[in-house]
Amino acid sequence: MERLLIRGGNPLRGDIRISGAKNAALPVMAATLLADGPTTVGNIPHLHDVTTTMELLGRMGVELTVHEGMEVEVNTATIHSFRAPYELVKTMRASILVLGPLLARFGQAEVSLPGGCAIGSRPVNIHVDGLRAMGAEIEVRDGYIKGRADRLQGAHIRMDVSTVTGTENLMMAAALARGTTVLENAAREPEVINLADCINAMGGHVQGAGTSTITIEGVDTLRGVHHRVLPDRIETGTYLVAAAMTGGEVRLKDTAPELVESVLGKLRESGAEVSAGRDWVTLRMEGRPRAVDLETAPYPGFPTDMQAQFCALNAISTGEGTVTETVFENRFMHCLEMQRMGADIQIEGARARIRGVEKLTAAPVIATDLRASASLVLAGLVAEGETRVDRIYHIDRGYECIEEKLAQLGADIQRVPD
């Protein structure tokens, strides 16, 4: 076990490179199971969840080769198992993404019910119901989803909830199904589009990704390709908020500003000077930010994965801001930890009312999930004294070398053993 120690007070200044998006890398790695030939995935972030996914594929017998620059070549010719065991799936909800590809290409799958962040109800019934509609025989027992199918059939599926992993799983399954599948109320996130681009490069026929209706014409086989993962929009937003909170000036490279327009808008509203080009964005903040109101929503709305970071920004801003969470329940646990640092936050159901204070005071805090841990690091960057963030295995699931990148920008931060 490790922790982060942060001495606040240093404005962040300089340039850093943004990593590939975890939430794009994981479904694309699952999609490699669909291809007959080897697939190479580029711009893979070096993260715990990616390592877990590679271990999961390796347990199935898939051959993986890691090249320079975190390019991963995946060859499924040696696959001999179609089981995703509990000891791997329990740490990462995205493991369920292998369910659709395994059923579609190999006709069988046994996937443990998933784990991951403790941020409310994320039921798997949408995955199961959709695959059943495509003809799969599925039972859930002994903690596993067990499925069989001769060949999946195209179906018209309306998802009760717009879910990213549900959309991705069913889209991958439909890619090799017989006939046409229509997904209604589909997630519109950029990571869904990135996955559709990968499937189409393999020879698939996916249309409408990025809209609420996706149509997939199934094909008999898919081929291996070289696919590059898109930049991490949440990492981009996190470092921009960090710079705004510390009164700094940063330039982020190898990113995609068009994917974070809602975040950039709120940062400008807070008083930051923001500029962007094709693959870069800069931010400069003079003095304290102004508090902002925001409400999370599925893409292209304000991302729930940036909510905690803006709670931290509001905590040291001038004025009062209200943050409303509409995507997940139970996602204000970071606010309780920030209160221990002196933040003035009132939780009212799905709403956090935050009155900015002039300073936060360092304290030992505990990370409860991935984005909560990031917000506590941001709070530590501006707190007086030394902040200790425990349980940072959460942050390692979604941020590549966070202490190294922050230190590169001038933060006083170090990783130490417990």
Curated annotation (Swiss-Prot):
Subcellular location: Cytoplasm
Annotated family: Belongs to the EPSP synthase family. MurA subfamily.
Pathway where this protein functions: Cell wall biogenesis; peptidoglycan biosynthesis
Signal peptide: none
EC annotation from Swiss-Prot or TrEMBL: 2.5.1.7
HAMAP family (UniProt xref): MurA
PANTHER family assigned to the protein according to its UniProt record, in alphabetical order: UDP-N-ACETYLGLUCOSAMINE 1-CARBOXYVINYLTRANSFERASE
Protein origin, superkingdom: Bacteria
GO molecular function (one): UDP-N-acetylglucosamine 1-carboxyvinyltransferase activity
Any GO BP: cell division
Cytoplasm keyword on record: yes
Residues engaged in binding UDP-N-acetyl-alpha-D-glucosamine: 93, 305, 327
Protein name: UDP-N-acetylglucosamine 1-carboxyvinyltransferase
Catalyses which reaction(s): phosphoenolpyruvate + UDP-N-acetyl-alpha-D-glucosamine = UDP-N-acetyl-3-O-(1-carboxyvinyl)-alpha-D-glucosamine + phosphate
Species for this entry: Halorhodospira halophila (strain DSM 244 / SL1)
Gene, per the UniProt record: murA
